[in-house]
Amino acid sequence: SEQLHESYKASVADNEILKDKDPSYRVLNLNDPWQDTSTSYYHKSIGGYHAAKLRRYQELIDHRLSPEYMSTVQSLQKAKTEEDVMAVFASTTSLNMLNMRYIIYNPTQRPIRNPYAYGNAWFIGQVQIVSNADAEMKALDSLNPLETVVVDKRFANNLIGFVPQKDTTAAIVMTSYKPNVVTYKSKAVSEQLAIFSEIYYQPGWKAFVDGKLTPH
């Protein structure tokens, strides 16, 4: 409605981000992101609020995203040069994994663009099997998500027989995005393991590979 739109009037930062027509990025508003709802009015937001929380994602917020958010705020407050700012994002691996391309630091100013965002999907070269979900979370403290995926041993059977092979020509990109349909296009000369920058939620979703319904 017009009243709602007025309540969420676009800021300078919002308008600048909206110039980017790529469907694949996310935005982090540094103004209390886990309670903020305004960012989601215009953008795919890393933050936001809902009373009914997905437990696994909430654990990711508590153990990885919130500490990286706090570190980002503190580091930006101390940064004196553009190099200082860019160095901040090199270490925010979990936020980069969620494809954080833009950061709203001051709504009245242009957003900060993060050159380290991983994109909406990528292929990895190593698989690390761990004992449980807690070990998965702990592994995120040290692994490079662009190179390695960590997998709970409960799902190890899904990878039987798969050996990652380096393919420098392999690529996977999002071609369209809707709340209930996300489409990707990929190319590779050998079998690859794709990592998607999404929250896994099985009920209601179906996966298709080359048009064929595929278990997920």
Please tell me what each predicted stretch does.
Residues S1-K53, I112:
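Extracytoplasmic
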